[in-house]
């Protein structure tokens, strides 16, 4: 525990590592397999020992609610009078008992990750969430006292079409109606927060040979979504910076020849300046016309020497 971090004086406990879902874009699912889950008794022992020092805790896991003892963990932390923070909850794991424990301690915001606006694209990325499940779980969230639901979504996914992007708007509009109806019934104002990021291809995943969508394409899609959501009440749109997406994609797929760029970043040179000054070098790594060198020349990928175990 320390006050000198982003999550100051918060007890962070890893409850599991890895994920059973194997979404095709997710590095953690493939790099951390097989999944490891720590017993509730050990987790609560750590919490009891730290309780005199803080009343704030966060649970670390790729899929927190996949833990087979998650209800016991949350109940035990609640009995210790911890304020519990969950980064997000897997959609199919949302159940009333979990929501009630969180709501009882005053939590009113929740985050989930549908990733795409329709079932076709979710199936392609191996995200096992139907539209009906998404609506049902959102209704359950708002019915249990939550007033803010954040939705993590992506644009630029492999096989994505313009219709898929429009379906993001339709899906959010459907969930907005649920939020308004449940909020009105309880005398509350409910809000949806679609947070849209660019798909970043990662090493050691089935999509490692994919390229980042063009900057022009990403800008158009994010601008379209911003325009659509600006006209929706009870919706607060959050969009990723395209420059940030390019930088993340470069960090994910660069090789040792980019060491000088990293050194400049570490010395404090603004990323925006680096993207401008090294535009061609960075573009050669992240542009749609440039795939993993191994796929073109037979040369080993920059990350091929890294063991996932």
Please state what every model-predicted region is:
Residues 21, 68-70, 97-98, 120-125, ...:
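Flexible glycine/acidic-rich beta-alpha junction loops that bind and position SAM and/or redox cofactors
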Residues 25-42:
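Iron-sulfur (Fe-S) cluster-binding segments and ferredoxin-like electron-carrier domains
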Residues 222, 231-309:
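Radical SAM enzyme core and accessory elements
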Residues 20-27, 51-56, 82, 116-119, ...:
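Short acidic (Asp/Glu) and glycine-rich catalytic loops that position anionic groups and cofactors
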């Amino acid at each position: 525990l320390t006050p000198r971090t982003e999550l100051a004086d918060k007890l962070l406990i890893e409850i599991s590592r890895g994920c059973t879902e194997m979404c095709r874009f997710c590095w953690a699912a493939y790099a951390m397999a097989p999944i490891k889950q720590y017993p509730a008794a050990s987790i609560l022992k750590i919490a009891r020992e730290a309780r005199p020092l803080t009343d704030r805790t966060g649970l670390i896991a790729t899929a927190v609610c996949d833990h087979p003892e998650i209800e016991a963990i949350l109940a035990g932390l609640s009995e210790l009078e911890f304020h519990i923070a969950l980064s997000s909850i897997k959609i199919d794991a949302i159940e009333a008992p979990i929501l009630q424990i969180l709501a009882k301690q005053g939590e009113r915001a929740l985050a989930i990750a549908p990733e795409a606006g329709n079932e076709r694209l979710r199936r392609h990325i191996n995200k096992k969430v139907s539209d009906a499940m998404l609506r049902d779980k959102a209704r359950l969230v708002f019915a249990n006292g939550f007033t803010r639901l954040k939705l993590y979504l992506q644009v630029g996914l492999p096989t994505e079409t313009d219709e898929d992007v429009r379906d993001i708007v339709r899906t959010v509009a459907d969930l907005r109606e649920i939020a308004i109806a449940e909020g009105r019934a309880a005398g509350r104002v409910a809000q949806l927060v679609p947070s849209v990021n660019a798909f970043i291809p990662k090493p050691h995943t089935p999509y490692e040979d994919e390229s980042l969508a063009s900057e022009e394409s990403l800008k158009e899609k994010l601008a379209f979504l911003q325009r659509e959501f600006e006209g929706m009440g009870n919706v607060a749109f959050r969009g990723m910076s395209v420059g940030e997406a390019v930088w993340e994609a470069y960090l994910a797929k660069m090789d040792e020849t980019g060491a000088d760029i990293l050194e400049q970043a570490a010395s404090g040179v603004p990323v925006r300046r680096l993207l401008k000054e090294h535009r061609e070098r960075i573009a050669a790594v992240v542009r749609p016309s440039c795939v993993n060198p191994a796929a073109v020349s037979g040369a080993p990928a920059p990350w091929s020497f890294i063991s996932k175990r």
